[in-house]
Amino acid sequence: MTEKINKKDNYHLIFALIFLAIISVVSMMVGSSFIPLQRVLMYFINPNDSVDQFTLEVLRSPRITLAILAGAALGMSGLMLQNVLKNPIASPDIIGITGGASLSAVVFIAFFSHLTIHLLPLFAVLGGAVAMMILLVFQTKGQIRPTTLIIIGISMQTLFIALVQGLLITTKQLSAAKAYTWLVGSLYGATFKDTIILGMVILAVVPLLFLVIPKMKISILDDPVAIGLGLHVQRMKLIQLITSTILVSMAISLVGNIGFVGLIAPHIAKTIVRGSYAKKLLMSAMIGAISIVIADLIGRTLFLPKEVPAGVFIAAFGAPFFIYLLLTVKKL
């Protein structure tokens, strides 16, 4: 039975990878100008001889690559948060991590944009970490029900959004415009430098994931049971929280405030993959990547010549999905 599940999981992972590759190639082809598949393939074979080098290399490739990396980061972080909080509707944007990172990023854009832009991810990570620590303080105060923890997270997110809106009203018009574009979640202006930064962060946290993955089946159990089986529960939680906070904060610092990916991707992944936690993590990463690539593709082609941020389409699907989970998930 286990072998049959593993085979199915492998097939699903391969299919997801192929689908991600196909949708990425389609995204390379479609935009303000259509580039035939043959010319896209020629660019990959010999970029320097391609007549579409500028469009593909400067405008589309960085954007698609960043969408894949950001989606993967958000998908993995969502799965880890649901595991740590033992709450099926936990996600970075719902429990306030995204809000904390967004507030810090907007503070940077509004008041410190004259400094190097490379400090923006650092500000976002610090904001996300503060939000997570506040949530942990509430969790360690006693036996808080999962629903209560989610309500606290939503309250924090609402507070952060209110503070962001206040900043946008009082700051300079140009800075406010930059912050607004970032807040709605757009991949416009993505560069290969952005993809390198996020790619390096993801690679840097891989060793932390290897510490977590082998023990995930035990950590899913209730804390007393896991401790009885020899698991350092608090250490495992801390590793996952640090990893997920870094991934979320770095991703949204580069692509903006794209919500609900960390909620949707893990649920779809857990529905498709029934086996190991490692495969669920990989599937969450791929579902997250696919969702942002598709949302960005729709956003920049559906209303040409105008462009709608990817975050708008993710939210349009994610909000009803969240309500559905609230109505159907048991034992909250």
Q: What do these predicted ranges mean?
A:
Residues 1-332:
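Alpha-helical transmembrane segments in inner-membrane proteins
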